[in-house]
A protein has these predicted regions:
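N-terminal Rossmann-like NAD(P)+-binding domain of SDR-like oxidoreductases, especially those catalyzing
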Residues: 4-200
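C-terminal substrate-binding subdomain of Rossmann-fold SDR/epimerase-dehydratase oxidoreductases
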Residues: 223-354
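Short-chain dehydrogenase/reductase
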Residues: 114, 163-171, 207, 211-215, ...
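Pocket-edge positions in alpha/beta enzyme catalytic cores
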Residues: 74, 113, 161, 209, ...
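Short, flexible, glycine-rich and Lys/Arg-enriched loop motifs at helix boundaries
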Residues: 55, 195-217, 227-247
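Short, solvent-exposed loop/helix junctions and linker helices
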Residues: 23, 115-118, 211-215, 249-252, ...
Length: 354
């Protein structure tokens, strides 16, 4: 990859069109970003196939912001259906979240991930070109850095071979976008490389809603605490202070605000493509997260140690100074607030039929 060393100066005029398409907008990060966008006065059009989300989130968004966004239940792989949305709506920009995202599942079923994650992106880029939509904000991931030994990672950290097919789709996605931007006189893109989003909205109305069994650390722990079930820690022999993997956890509302900041940045920047790490810069181990949940919930978690999982990275956390300087963005939420909001959401979610 070129790491975006070639920067093309491009004129950007403030568009009179203010509709933002948010793919995967009923998902975890997507729904929080939709709320943030709407609270900033932007019109949002959601495209989501509901494969890992619920239509009930629409009414939850309405409870928070006072109105429902426009919603289309469409699979992005179906380019004809997506084209109808572009024909009907006056679109200014696209924020692309929709993707399969489970590292372990991608190892077992890689072709599912390559087909969905890459075809959907290519379809969007083709339609953006066809309908002269010039701004794309891409949901990338720290997985593009692979199992790097350089921490904290900066945007200049080499993009290595991915540790999972999911990570590979993010690397390929970034390359596809870079090639599309370099071949276009008008297309601009910002790539946000998230670290580990956690927590839930401060209203308690939206949070991580897994369809089926949860697969991410925070909801698994919160549900295990409430059900008094056993929590499995995968790996205790990593080269970390307590032997368990270390991650940079960022509150989902901080992540949502980074998207709004990036969208505003694209309006005024002459840079054709850029990448930003979005994290807190602090690494916490699995055992440290467990202790925080136990301290706040006043409950003891039953844990067992299992073998390492294929595709898991040993340790990674962000250097987000570039985002702080260029996007004027700073994370606000502490680890304690992340955990508390997760527990509040879990209590709310468990009382609902969905």
């Amino acid at each position: 990859m070129s790491y975006f060393r070639i920067v093309t100066a491009r004129k950007t005029t403030m568009s009179t069109k203010k509709k933002v398409v948010v793919t995967g907008g009923l998902g975890y990060i997507g729904s929080h970003t939709v709320v943030e966008l709407m609270q900033q006065g932007l019109e949002v059009v959601i495209i989501d196939n509901l494969c890992n989300s619920s239509v009930h989130i629409l009414s939850q968004i309405e409870e928070i912001v006072g109105k429902k966004p426009v919603f289309y239940q469409i699979d992005l792989v179906d380019i004809s259906a997506v084209r109808e949305v572009f024909e009907k709506e006056d679109i200014d920009s696209v924020i692309h979240f929709a993707a399969h995202l489970l590292v372990n599942e991608s190892v077992v079923n890689p072709l599912k991930y390559y087909r969905n994650n890459l075809v959907s992106l290519i379809n969007l880029l083709e339609l953006m070109n066809e309908f002269s939509v010039q701004k794309l904000l891409f949901s990338s991931s720290c997985t593009v850095y692979g199992d790097t030994k350089q921490v904290p990672v900066t945007e200049e950290t080499p993009v290595f071979k991915a540790s999972s097919p999911y990570g590979a789709t993010k690397i390929m996605g970034e390359q596809i976008i870079e090639d599309a931007v370099n071949s276009s006189p008008v297309l601009k893109s910002v790539l946000l490389r998230y670290f580990n989003p956690v927590g839930a909205h401060s209203s308690g109305k939206i949070g991580e809603l897994s369809i089926g069994k949860p697969s991410h650390l925070f909801p698994i722990i919160s549900q295990a605490i409430e059900s008094e079930s056993i929590f499995m820690v995968f790996g205790k022999d990593y080269h970390t202070p307590d032997g368990t993997p270390v991650r940079d956890y960022i509150h989902v509302q901080d992540l949502a605000s980074a998207h709004v900041a990036a969208l505003q940045h694209m309006e005024k920047s002459s840079c054709s493509i850029d990448a930003f790490n979005i994290g807190t810069g602090n690494g916490f181990s699995v055992l440290e997260i467990i202790r925080e949940f136990e301290n706040i919930s006043k409950k003891k978690l039953k844990i067992t140690f299992e073998e390492r999982r294929e595709g898991d990275v040993e340790k990674i956390w962000a250097d987000s100074n570039k985002a702080k300087e260029k996007l004027n963005w700073t994370p606000r939420f502490s680890l304690e607030e992340m955990v508390r909001s997760c527990l509040v959401w879990e209590n709310y979610r468990s009382s609902r039929d969905w």
